[in-house]
Amino acid sequence: MAHESHESKAPAGAGEAEAVEVTVVLPAHNEAERIECAVEETERALSSFCRRYEIIIAEDGSTDNTAEIARKIAEKRKNVRFMHSDERLGRGRALNRAFKKARGEVLAYIDVDLSTDMRHLRELIDAIRVEKYDFATGSRLLKASHTQRSLKREAMSRLYNFLVRLLLRSKLRDHQCGFKAFSRDALFSILDEVEDKHWFWDTELLVKAQWRGFSVKEIPVHWEERSGGTKVKLLKDSISMLSNVLKMWLNERCGERGKGKGF
């Protein structure tokens, strides 16, 4: 059963608690070794340009001691909240659940491995907060991006994103970078249409956002593959995601575009 085990108290009264500028969600499944560092780095980056923020650790059915560590972090840090699920929800469902509990006007999520350089966080948030884009995403595949990862993963990523552009008519270069931000209103207007529960969530969200006419900014980032970092199983998850691209394309061809059906 999924439940929220801990939620840190707001630093002041209810009125101020509602006036959160930015919420950053950290999805965490078996991240005991990295979650504390991820929270520290995220809070350091956020506090340098934002006064009213919160960080939500969306712990997702971990079998190590991620939940215990995350609970202690939330108890010690006033701007950190902790959500726990006894069962594995999948990355997409865990993000959906956390965003629906978030208080920020700008909502974002960052992969806990911090492969994306945190110096880009302000640019990501300001794309929504200042430039008024509806969605913003880091990109490892723009000319100005700097990416370090294996040739196999680079080739698979380029092929995958090419097929998404070709079949689903996306204008973006990179759909899967775990470094995204959203306008609260824009995200909530489309969130229930996104049905994938795991890795394809990002692609489905960004493609449907474009189909709905939302503005999306793609930001070149410095990105470095971390040792033991990714939870993606290259062959299995690649086949699954390519299958989802084909399903989405077939549904769109059958007149289902924008209706959130067929997944």
Feature roles, as predicted:
Residues N79-K101, V106, S115-W199, E225-S243, ...:
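Acceptor/aglycone-binding surface of glycosyltransferases and processive sugar-polymer synthases
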Residues L26, R51-S62, M83-S85:
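Short beta-strand/loop segment that forms part of the nucleotide-sugar
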Residues M1-E21, R165-S170, E193-F263:
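Hydrophobic helical membrane-anchoring modules
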Residues M1-R44, R51:
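N-proximal low-complexity "stem/linker" segments adjacent to membrane-targeting elements
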Residues E59-A67, L114:
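A conserved acidic beta->alpha catalytic loop
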Residues A38, T66, L95, R119-L121, ...:
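Acidic donor-diphosphate engagement hotspot in glycosyltransferases and nucleotidyltransferases
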Residues E31-R34, S62, R91, D117:
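Donor nucleotide-sugar binding loop of glycosyltransferases
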